[in-house]
């Protein structure tokens, strides 16, 4: 399956217990869309008005983490749901979802109502989170996976260094690490590559400042580690199944 991807639209986490993951993510200082309506989403201010920027939590078996790629034209399954804001205003969301692809789990999406993921009360977070900047994956052969995705998405590919490939279609980056490079880069949280590869393992979230986030995590008894560049790292166990790298912008 080949597409002309505009950007990585969102990260989709299919979990056995999404509400447990939502609770952990709230302890990290994220706002989520209202409980009781699937999916629960962590939404951010997007770079483009018609390309949302978010993470979604879905209930399902087996658990899988997949990338959603935004396209302008797509035929597929139409999914609709409605959330209610705190002031009682109903927000309707409609998304057309295409077939799954590989070698990393991914699928194409076309938004009927992109504004639904940009409500002001959902894109402001107590931890100062601003945007989903990057997604991290691990593969035995990063170059081969990057090459396959370049062809599938009409993407640009760059070798950052030996053991790390960058795949880019828009604003949000995909970094594909070798197991050794990933474990070395994120050794502060004792990161371990999954057994089944390739796999998506984490995200980079832009935040305003590091110190308020650190104070919030300490107050909520959430373990974290610090890395070069004032980055704040939380392990998958603390953050709903994915490693989170918080990158301060100030």
Question: Where are these predicted regions, by residue range?
Answer:
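Glyoxalase I/VOC metalloenzyme domain signal
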Residues: 1-9, 13-33, 43-250
């Amino acid at each position: 399956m080949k597409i002309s991807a505009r950007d990585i639209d969102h990260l989709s986490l299919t979990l056995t217990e999404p509400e447990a993951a939502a609770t952990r993510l709230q302890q990290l200082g994220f706002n989520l869309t209202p409980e009781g309506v699937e999916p629960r989403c962590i939404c951010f201010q997007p770079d483009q008005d018609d390309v949302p920027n978010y993470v979604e939590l879905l209930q399902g078996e087996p658990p899988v983490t997949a990338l959603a790629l935004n396209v302008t034209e797509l035929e597929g399954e139409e999914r609709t749901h409605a959330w209610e804001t705190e002031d009682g205003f109903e927000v309707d969301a409609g998304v057309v979802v295409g077939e799954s692809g590989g070698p990393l789990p991914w699928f194409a999406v076309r938004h009927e109502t992109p504004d639904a993921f940009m409500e002001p009360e959902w894109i402001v977070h107590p931890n100062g989170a601003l945007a989903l900047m990057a997604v991290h994956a691990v593969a035995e052969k990063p170059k081969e996976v990057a090459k396959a995705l370049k062809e599938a998405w009409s993407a640009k590919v760059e070798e950052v260094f030996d053991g790390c490939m960058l795949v880019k279609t828009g604003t949000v980056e995909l970094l594909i690490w070798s197991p050794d490079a990933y474990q070395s880069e994120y050794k502060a949280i004792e990161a371990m590559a999954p057994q089944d590869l390739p796999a998506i393992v984490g995200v980079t979230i832009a935040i305003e400042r590091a110190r308020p986030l650190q104070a919030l995590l300490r107050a909520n008894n959430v373990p974290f580690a610090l890395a070069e560049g004032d980055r704040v790292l939380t392990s998958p166990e603390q953050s709903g199944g994915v490693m989170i790298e918080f990158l301060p912008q100030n």
